[in-house]
């Protein structure tokens, strides 16, 4: 097998891995939505009242 063929196979594997990772990540967003909402609620509850958390203006502002 030549270097060109090995490089093409490598690119194919990287592309396939990226596509599978991207589609599985989008599919899991719906299932993790309640957990994400709980985390943001905890940030608002415990962090927004403290001056140390000024680095999250889009959540607390």
Swiss-Prot record:
Residues that make up the propeptide removed upon maturation: 22-44
Tissues/organs with expression: Expressed by the venom duct.
Gene Ontology cellular-component terms listed: extracellular region; host cell postsynaptic membrane
Signal peptide residue numbers: 1-21
Keyword Lyase: no
Disulfide bond residue pairs: 47-53, 48-60
One Pfam family matching this protein: Toxin_8
Main location, first listed in the record: secreted
Matches recorded under InterPro entries: Conotoxin_a-typ
Localization: Secreted
Top-level taxonomic group: Eukaryota
Modified residues (Pyrrolidone carboxylic acid): 45
GO MF term set: acetylcholine receptor inhibitor activity; ion channel regulator activity; toxin activity
Modified residues (Cysteine amide): 60
UniProt keyword Disulfide bond, yes or no: yes
Keywords from the UniProt entry: Acetylcholine receptor inhibiting toxin, Amidation, Disulfide bond, Ion channel impairing toxin, Neurotoxin, Postsynaptic neurotoxin, Pyrrolidone carboxylic acid, Secreted, Signal, Toxin
Domain remarks: The cysteine framework is I (CC-C-C). Alpha4/6 pattern.
Recorded family membership: Belongs to the conotoxin A superfamily.
Record's function text: Alpha-conotoxins act on postsynaptic membranes, they bind to the nicotinic acetylcholine receptors (nAChR) and thus inhibit them.
Name of the protein in its database record: Alpha-conotoxin-like Lp1.6a
Species of the source: Conus leopardus (Leopard cone)
